[in-house]
Curated annotation (Swiss-Prot):
Catalytic activity: S-adenosyl-L-methionine + H(+) = S-adenosyl 3-(methylsulfanyl)propylamine + CO2
Source organism, top-level taxon: Bacteria
Assembly and oligomerization: Heterotetramer of two alpha and two beta chains arranged as a dimer of alpha/beta heterodimers.
Site (Cleavage (non-hydrolytic)): 62-63
Protein name, per record: S-adenosylmethionine decarboxylase proenzyme
UniProt entry tagged with the keyword Magnesium: no
CC cofactor note: Binds 1 pyruvoyl group covalently per subunit.
Disulfide bond annotation, renumbered to this chain: none
Keywords: Autocatalytic cleavage, Decarboxylase, Lyase, Polyamine biosynthesis, Pyruvate, S-adenosyl-L-methionine, Schiff base, Spermidine biosynthesis, Zymogen
Pathway named in the protein's UniProt entry: Amine and polyamine biosynthesis; S-adenosylmethioninamine biosynthesis; S-adenosylmethioninamine from S-adenosyl-L-methionine: step 1/1
C-alpha cells in the first residue's frame, strides 16, 4: 500500500489578531511556509473579509496550502496537502504556526490516494 499524498489538517489557536487579520502578512507567511517546505509555487489567491478574517490558497506543484482565519478568536484552520516524497507538509505547518505566534496547535496527518497493490501494479507504483 502506498499513498499519493500527505494532508496535514491543523487547528491553530492563540494566534496574533493583528497577523491573522492582515491579508498581506497572512499571504506572505503562507507563501514562505510553502517555500520552507521546498514546494514550487504556481498560484496565490487571498481574500480579506469585513469586518475581519482572511482566506487564501497557495497552489503548489505538489498540491496546496489553504487557510481560513478568525482573528477575533485567534484561530486559523490550515490545510497543507503535498503529493510525492520531496515536500514535507510538517515543515510548512511548523513554519506558519511559529509566524502566527500560535499558543496551541492540534494537527493530524491523513494519507490521500492510498493505492492498494492491484492498483499500484497497474500504474507501476
Amino acid at each position: 500500500m502506498r499513498a499519493l499524498g500527505r494532508h496535514v489538517l491543523a487547528e491553530v489557536y492563540g494566534c496574533s489578531f493583528e497577523i491573522l487579520n492582515d491579508i498581506k502578512k497572512v499571504e506572505e507567511i503562507m507563501v514562505k511556509a510553502a517555500l520552507e517546505a521546498g514546494a514550487e509555487i504556481r498560484e496565490v489567491c487571498f481574500h480579506k473579509f469585513s469586518p475581519q478574517g482572511v482566506s487564501g490558497v497557495v497552489v503548489i506543484s505538489e498540491s496546496h496550502l489553504a487557510i481560513h482565519t478568525w482573528p477575533e478568536l485567534g484561530y486559523a484552520a490550515v490545510d497543507v496537502f503535498t503529493c510525492g516524497e520531496r515536500v514535507n507538509p510538517w515543515d510548512a505547518c511548523r513554519y506558519l504556526t511559529e509566524k502566527f505566534k500560535a499558543a496551541d496547535v492540534h494537527a493530524t496527518e491523513i494519507e490521500r490516494g492510498v493505492i492498494e497493490p492491484p492498483q499500484a501494479a497497474a500504474v507501476n507504483l
